[in-house]
Amino acid sequence: MSQQTTIRKLAELVNTPVDKLLVQLAEAGMKFSGPDQVVTSTEKMKLLGFLRRTHGKAETSAEAASEAAKKITLNRRKLQEVTVNAGRTKTTVNVEVRQKRTYVKSENEGGGRAAPMTPDEERADILRKLEESRQRNLEEQQRLAESDRVRDEAIQRKREEEQAAKDRAEAERKAAEEAAAAASAPAPVADAPKPSAAAPAARLPSSPSSAPRAARPAGASPASRPAAPARADDRSNAAKHKTRGSHVMVAGVEDDDATKRFAGQLHLSAADRARRSNVRGKPTGRPGSSSSRRGNDSGRGGSQANSGPHGFERPTAPVVREVAIGETITVADLAQKLALKGGDVVKALFKMGVMATITQSIDHDTAALVTEELGHKAVRADNADFEDALLAHAEDAQGEATSRPPVVTIMGHVDHGKTSLLDYIRRTKIASGEAGGITQHIGAYHVETGRGVISFLDTPGHAAFTSMRARGAKITDIVVLVVAADDGVMPQTKEAVAHAKAAGVPLIVAVNKIDKTGADPLRVKNELLAENVVAEEFGGDTQFIEVSAKLGTGVDTLLDAISLQAEVLELKAVAEGRASGTVIESSLDKGRGPVATVLVQQGALKRGDYLVCGIQYGRVRALFDETGHQPASAGPSIPVQVLGLSGVPEAGDDFVVVDDERLAKDVAQQRETKRRESRLVASATNRMEDILAQMGKGEGQQVLNLVIKADVQGSVEALKQSLVALSNEDIRINVIHSGVGGITESDANSAAASKATIIGFNVRADASARKIVESNGIDLRYFSIIYDVIDQVKQVASGLLGVEIREEIIGIAQVRDVFRSSKFGAVAGCMVIEGVVKRSKPIRVLRDSVVVFEGELESLRRFKENVDEVRNGTECGIGVKAYNDVKAGDQIECFERIEVARTL
């Protein structure tokens, strides 16, 4: 190669485009203006060295050794943990990351370079390298072409095999339909063909390594199957692409039926279900059936159900369940009845806006709504098994009904003489023994008169005892409404009329206190006309009897009216058998335990009977009447006190006598469970509402916690209703605990934990409770009159409200002129036109009746002297602090802020 080699000539020799060669020369640090310039041998060697360095190769063997000495390679290994999904679970896999990095020593730091090659050696070396590069490119192109050809052939072969599999599946389906039709046709037993000798040969062995099926549908020739090499290739492809689910290999043989099963056919025809059960079941030997085929489920270790009426079939339509739901049900139990996960039911409740946990109880309405939301049907469950048993007992007690005494309830306003009238009838002094002279619980008595036995219920007249009066009207036969002739109709009088009408019982009006000078019975009749109570003399049907409980005037006439009304009603009841009735009042007596005052309405109550009373039960240990005697039994319309119950029953609960203690205990426990669940559901439902309400109210609302203990259940109920009703948006009365009986140690601990006030109504605290009260500084208060309880709780609640700041205007001054002062700035010359202006009070500046400034007085002078106040009709000078825009005609309003105690 001559020294006059141009760039164009060199490009032809190395088979490289001229432009590319110019770029490479430029990258090697040699600048040429055109392809006709001459390239020297030194420049060629420099280009070759650049290209070798670019491709990571040494220029010569000596250079290679030198390059190796200039390089250092560092290997780094790093262990990591990667979490991958494996079905429903997650698996942690250890991964090792290897990094390799090579560092090359700079050329400036190296030694001298090797001797340059001769031009002939350089040319031969370049040609050899170019030839090797062309050979490698050619081999790579051939390899890619061969790979494309093999891939195309595999795709084509796969399509042909899939088409052949579809054809075979269609033929098998038709054969299965024909076999199912033949099997469904009735045939005599005598005509059943025997299995032929060739039948076993047609069946496939049960071994997994057996050959493919021998039995093939008509029309499927052996030529349609692929060749053995294609099978091998197909198996390799299936192994590589098994995630696609195109083919399934069983014991080294392609299983088309398995492929079809994994394709996910959910809705199957009758023929498909018959064919599938035949494939999975054992051979039956019936000619024409496809049961001779191999079952592919042996690998899972369990045998499948045989075809027939008892075989399992996948449901093809949504299953709608009928779920029985009681009054309450837990989320877990509801999910079990719906055959769902508990989390799914909780999610459905969240979507409906109900925040519940899987163990929480929900009411029937909520459970029914979520059941309908999930696509099922909810029905109300009948949980009254024990209640039905009680009804059966009550029906067994039915016998011949005989006349019974009337039950008369005395109702009316407070201090109208109800108890005094009853005292005169009974010839006792009950009213004198009442605290404050007012009745605070229902009293039950029966009186033997010349006209027969009459049972009386004395109800409280105070507004707090509304529920007591309603309970008395519910169990009564006749209501005697006592109205004071000198006082007329009062609020509780109207309420008693409403209770009597709601209960549907006749009303007799006793106009009391007619012996007083201001008595006006006609006024009472006219006022009751507004309540639709019309006297007989006005054309109505209500008897008005004028009586005097003090003198006894008209009492006999009243008893005659009661007896007449009872005869009209024809009151009857069964006097024998198991007793039933209603609890009028209950209490907890020291030494006697729970005591319940009951009114027998059916049957006869005897000592030793097993009693169920609400959620309480027990055996009757003793019976007491209102005089303290112990009768042997109590018949209909007779009130008695019962001892022996397991706890204090609620006033108004019904009681019934049962045969044995076991039934009584079961019924009481079931009622208690239902009541507790209902209470939990109510508290859980209101919990979030209370939280949101507290968030909305913030810190503005005060809370007064109370612990209430009383002598009887009715008083507890009345106190709770009256005190909770005092709550408003500023203060909330919260009764954290209430009960019947004395104040115990647990009551004191509850009050100490919640910083509550203990209210004892006709009860006292024991020694241990008093010790806790003293050590913790608990507020303990005793009461015997309900008026005092309400008044004192109002005072305590008002003290929690704090004080209210009010502004009161004390004086107004009219600005007549404005003066300038070097010390105070603008000084207003004013005339006090109203009240008094004081220096220490805040002021407002009004302009055209609009407040333009609010601040305080800086200076108040009269005749250049500082004064504390200026009264009406006096001139003065007023300096307003930090305000210099006072103008003539403005008004300066002086006011003071006062604190006013807030009340309920």
From Swiss-Prot:
Region of interest (G1), residue spans: 412-419
Protein's UniProt keywords contain Isomerase: no
Protein location: Cytoplasm
G4: annotated span: 512-515
Broad class of where this protein is predominantly found: cytoplasm
Chain ranges of the tr-type G domain: 403-572
Annotated region described as Disordered, given as residue ranges: 102-122, 134-252, 267-316
One function term, GO molecular function aspect: GTP binding
UniProt-annotated stretches for the region G3: 458-461
InterPro entries per the UniProt record, alphabetical: DNA-bd_dom_put_sf, EF-G-like_DII, EFTu-like_2, IF2_assoc_dom_bac, IF2_II, IF2_N, P-loop_NTPase, Small_GTP-bd
Biased composition annotated in UniProt, kind: Basic and acidic residues: 134-177
Keyword annotations of the record: Cytoplasm, GTP-binding, Initiation factor, Nucleotide-binding, Protein biosynthesis
Signal peptide positions (record): none
Key word RNA-binding present: no
Gene Ontology CC entries for this record: cytosol
Record region (G2): 437-441
CDD domains in the cross-refs: IF2_eIF5B, IF2_mtIF2_II, mtIF2_IVc
Region (G5): 548-550
Biased composition (Low complexity): 178-230
Amino acids binding GTP: 412-419, 458-462, 512-515
PANTHER family: TR-TYPE G DOMAIN-CONTAINING PROTEIN, TRANSLATION INITIATION FACTOR IF-2-RELATED
Similarity comment: Belongs to the TRAFAC class translation factor GTPase superfamily. Classic translation factor GTPase family. IF-2 subfamily.
Functional summary from the UniProt entry: One of the essential components for the initiation of protein synthesis. Protects formylmethionyl-tRNA from spontaneous hydrolysis and promotes its binding to the 30S ribosomal subunits. Also involved in the hydrolysis of GTP during the formation of the 70S ribosomal complex.
Listed HAMAP family: IF_2_B
The protein's name: Translation initiation factor IF-2
